[in-house]
From Swiss-Prot:
Native source organism of the sequence: Bos taurus (Bovine)
Basic and acidic residues compositional bias, start-end: 88-110, 147-163, 179-190, 200-215
Chain positions covered by the region annotation Disordered: 16-37, 88-263
Pfam families: Cir_N (PF10197)
Chain's gene name: LENG1
Regions annotated as coiled coil: 16-46, 89-116
Keyword tags: Coiled coil, Phosphoprotein
InterPro entries: CIR_N_dom (IPR019339), LENG1-like (IPR039875)
Name of this chain's protein: Leukocyte receptor cluster member 1 homolog
Alphabetized SMART domains for the sequence: Cir_N
Residues recorded with modification Phosphoserine: S244
């Protein structure tokens, strides 16, 4: 703290120490004044309360004596009796008009749902029953679906599924119709009447030629003079030989899998 003792902002400076002491003394005085005011306010409030209590206690005997001395006064004291007696001479309005006005106001409040009696439901408070309590109209024109129902039907996923199923059934029906037509076509081409002699003779000659060619091929194969049969080119990629650029005859051929025999 001995660093720069000549500065005005130094903590241990005489002027600063005196200023702090003055501030502390002023704060103590303000706190004492605040406490004195609080005590004075509490004292005044207590004094006022006791005065009112004493005044009320002094009024009770005088009021009881006045009630006992008043002739024919057995009920409570009415302070506004004179004003009521003076107001008897005042002319009153039309009772019928006031009643009609009150009924009109009550009817409007009931229509708006503002006025309801105890134990009365919301449906009873309305002048017209709600739509769900109205009976269905018999023989009238059927009203179309509302906007909410149309939106619900359009967004219904079940309706979308049924539409796609209908398209699928229609497509399968069309394909089935084509197949039945194709199957029925040969039946239409079949002659209805018995074959003629020329047709029978042509069929017989065709069969004999086929048998003769088969027999000649068998004899040529047995005698060794048959020409080598050309093997048909395999079209299925899974049954063809593996590709070999230099020795295609040595390429391994995949094993042929026969289809399973049905029992």
């Amino acid at each position: 703290m001995n660093i720069l003792p000549k500065k005005s902002w130094h903590v241990r400076n005489k002027d600063n120490v005196a200023r702090v002491r003055r501030d502390e003394a002023r704060a103590r005085e303000e706190e004492k004044e605040r406490e004195r005011r609080v005590l004075l306010a509490q004292q005044e409030a207590r004094t006022e309360f006791l005065r009112k209590k004493a005044r009320h206690q002094n009024w009770l005997p005088a009021l009881e004596a006045a009630e006992a001395g008043a002739p024919g006064s057995s009920g409570p004291v009415d302070l506004f009796r004179e004003l009521l007696e003076e107001g008897k001479a005042v002319t009153k309005g039309n009772k019928e008009y006031e009643e009609e006005k009150r009924q009109e106001k009550e009817r409007q409040e009931k229509a708006l749902g503002i006025l309801t009696y105890l134990g009365q439901s919301a449906a009873e408070a309305q002048t017209q029953p709600p739509w769900y309590q109205l009976p269905p109209r018999q023989g009238g024109p059927a009203s179309g679906p509302g906007p909410d129902e149309r939106i619900k039907s359009r967004l219904d996923p079940l309706r979308e599924m049924q539409k796609h199923l209908g398209k699928k059934r229609k497509h399968s029906g069309d394909s089935g119709g084509h197949s039945t037509k194709e199957k029925a076509a040969p039946e239409k081409q079949r002659p209805k009447g018995p074959p003629s002699l020329e047709q029978l003779r042509a069929d017989r000659l065709r069969r004999e030629a086929a048998e003769r060619a088969r027999a000649e091929a068998l004899l040529a194969r047995v005698g060794g003079t048959a020409a080598p049969e050309e093997q048909p080119e395999e079209v299925d990629e899974r049954r063809r030989r593996y590709n070999s650029q230099f020795n295609p005859q040595l390429a391994r051929r995949p094993r042929r899998q026969d289809p399973p025999v049905a029992p």
